[in-house]
């Protein structure tokens, strides 16, 4: 990606983050970076791995989780720029696999099955509901117990069940993606430099070895 494209995507992400409360349309975001909707959508998806709309949903969902600790679903919906609590419900289920009511109550009536499994980045703690993944954390062996305790603190009213077999199937689905073009959507948070490095790492072909120097040169910061 050129430095111009990088700057455009960076500006778009900042705009979405600062204006999430009014749910800007694709046209408005594209205008901010001087592009047509069609070309901006393609550029953003190529760089971020998700569409601008989906990225905005991630931001909105995170803020919804914070608001629901002390606000009603109706109040949270309007503050987030959503037209009704039903839209908030659909958003939370789509992104977090839990309803606003379940999040606000700390998981009352919710069953979360969890397990610990080896993954490409070390051991992972995964939690799933009947709707999908609600927790995925990478931990060292020493941190695993603390991770389970943190999951229980986050969902104090939920029923937590250890289910190694059931959660293993989900981990397999997430990480063993062998078909060409298959990918996992990930929302990353970090400094501009960190995002550049992560992007460079993602572009290394499977099975190919590279050096720190090559990565540094690829992002314009030679060692």
What are these regions (language model features)?
Residues 1-80, 86-223:
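Basic nucleic-acid-binding alpha-helical/helix-turn surface characteristic of O6-alkylguanine DNA
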């Amino acid at each position: 990606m050129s430095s111009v494209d990088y700057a455009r995507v960076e500006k778009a992400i900042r705009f979405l983050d600062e204006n999430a409360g009014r749910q800007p349309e694709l046209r408005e975001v594209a205008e901010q970076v001087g592009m047509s909707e069609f070309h901006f959508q393609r550029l953003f998806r190529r760089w971020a791995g998700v569409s601008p709309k989906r990225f905005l949903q991630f931001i909105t969902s995170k803020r919804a989780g914070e608001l629901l600790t002390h606000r009603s679903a109706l109040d949270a919906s309007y503050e987030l720029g959503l037209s009704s609590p039903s839209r908030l419900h659909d958003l939370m289920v789509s992104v977090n696999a839990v309803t606003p009511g379940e999040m606000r109550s700390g998981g009352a009536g919710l069953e979360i099955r969890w397990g610990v499994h080896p993954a490409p980045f070390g051991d992972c703690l995964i939690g799933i509901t009947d709707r999908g993944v609600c927790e995925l954390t990478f931990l060292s062996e020493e941190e695993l117990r603390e991770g389970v305790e943190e999951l229980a603190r986050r969902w104090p009213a939920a029923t937590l069940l250890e289910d190694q077999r059931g959660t293993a199937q989900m981990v397999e689905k997430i990480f063993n993606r062998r078909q060409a073009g298959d990918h996992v959507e990930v929302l990353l948070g970090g400094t501009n430099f960190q995002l550049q490095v992560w992007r460079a790492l993602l572009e290394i072909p499977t099975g190919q070895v590279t050096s720190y120097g090559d990565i540094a040169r690829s992002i314009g910061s030679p060692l």
